[in-house]
């Protein structure tokens, strides 16, 4: 059994979900409210600009425009991105928790993630496969009632092929690329769908979605550019519902919400507003490790692989039982920090596969003993904060959390 414990506070995740739902359901202009508080004063500007139709070329102009559907503000739903095992925290446990909050839309990356989730939480929810459908897994998607997000014409053809094979209308989402340029139907493919609706024959397009590239940066004009492009495309698909906002998109304002929002990072305590603004979310993650070894070293002692740290005084060094095999980046060598009783303690020497050394010389003797718990991740050192130390993001910190930690759900 692992000596290190990873505690996931499900109540905090519930609270985060409720906050996001409240912002959406009540059209709370969170950024405006924050900007007007003295302690958060700054140059925050919510995106409330009027919708402007954007076209990439004149060819769409020859196609008759159709009116947009019913008001998006009505019946707005809050789903959850639980891909990558809920960012390393446990998709099954967290999905069951969100079910208690009436969440019914769960987004995963692949069919195997979707199948595992379906087996665990039953048939009452919608499970969306963001990477879409492929020849090898189409029958499994049908068997387990998983809905693919179709990202290109080839995936549409595959799903249509199996619709014909099964002689049934198959549900799907369409992903329109509005500028992030990863997955998603491109402009030419969307134009083909507009001009030839037979390309979607046999398919029930439930939602049209897109994905924001810089939603955590509320001042980035690219957000509005993507929004306008998305709305322009939606005019030609009046019967489909729409989804655009991820965690950061929720905070950009109601214009970005449409029918369904898809938070992920914010549920798990990561800051949806970027590193330069206060985090409105609760941190649900605590990683602790015990001191398993203590040694007094004299001035000039060298520590760890390749002797990258040399003591500059007589020092008391503690060793902790985790390392890069547990997803704790080697980049924290000689620059990471941990906490003992809310006191900052430096990491020294190279991060090893299974071990980390820390310098506890300056701590009170009463705080230093074998078995003493050390906070690696927690309220003193959130995933976002420790990510900043090595120039990465909190997402990577969470998704790297290894399987050797004993996970405890509270």
Swiss-Prot record:
The protein's enzyme class: isomerase
Pfam families: Ala_racemase_C, Ala_racemase_N
Binding site residues for substrate: 182, 353
Catalytic activity, EC: 5.1.1.1
Modified residues (N6-(pyridoxal phosphate)lysine): 83
Residues of the RPE1 insert domain: 28-76
Signal peptide range in chain numbering: none
CDD domains in the cross-refs: PLPDE_III_AR (cd00430)
NCBIfam families: alr, PRK00053.2-3, RPE1
HAMAP family linked: Ala_racemase (MF_01201)
Name the UniProt record assigns to this protein: Alanine racemase
Gene field: alr
